[in-house]
């Protein structure tokens, strides 16, 4: 009786390829950002703002899907950053420029340069924010973002555009305010101001009943006036960073004063 043919040796080379499901969501987010650029060029600014918010939803889902399906990869991390640059860096900058900033050129050459410079500053700060985030993935405290996250900055700018469009206020009328908005949002992205990341938010734990009531009220408000409610939420979140940072600084200074007083006070006599 002859011995059976031995099975072929397994290849030691790693399998090449990418995970499909999470990268499909990342591609969808990039497409939404690209569509926002096209819509803004065509003058459909409400559609452009909505597209950026859709990109934000898809961007928030790809990472969670990758963790749930255990399909995380370095390729996905880098691809997600490139998608974020398009959707939350270039797209909002171009929407702001075509909607409002371009009209500064009618006030002179210098003002026109200020318009595109503000748009570029926003896009550049988004790129720097994403690069810094990638280098601090394994080091930074996951409970907080260092600087305003690019989706939040895009949400602030796009909810403002969306709200003004619903109110029939043209961007040309706000061309002196829009660069201030773009610069503030851009600088907050590269700042060291801490923002709550919601990554440590309890998911499986029970929550107070009042939270359910607040969630229902929020949904009703979003249905009644989506753009205005999103703008209010974005403004409150943007303001929370400086407030939380100043509060933390005040607490640290108070602790330092207390320690200094303890060192200076004489020891009690026996």
What do these predicted ranges mean?
Residues 7-17, 41-47, 76, 107-116, ...:
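Short juxtamembrane and helix-loop transition motifs at transmembrane-helix boundaries
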Residues 1-10, 142-270:
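C-terminal membrane-associated helical module and adjoining short loops/tails
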Residues 35-50, 93-117, 160-177, 223-228:
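Helix-coil boundary and interhelical linker segments in multi-pass alpha-helical membrane proteins
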Residues 31, 57, 61, 65, ...:
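Active-site His/Glu-centered metal-binding helix of metallohydrolases
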Residues 34-37, 54, 58, 92, ...:
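Alpha-helical transmembrane segments of polytopic integral membrane proteins
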Residues 1-60, 244, 268-270:
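Topogenic membrane-insertion module of multi-pass membrane proteins
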Residues 116-155:
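Hydrophobic, well-structured mid-protein blocks that either form specific transmembrane helices
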Residues 21-26, 68-130, 160:
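Multi-pass membrane catalytic core of lipid/isoprenoid biosynthesis enzymes
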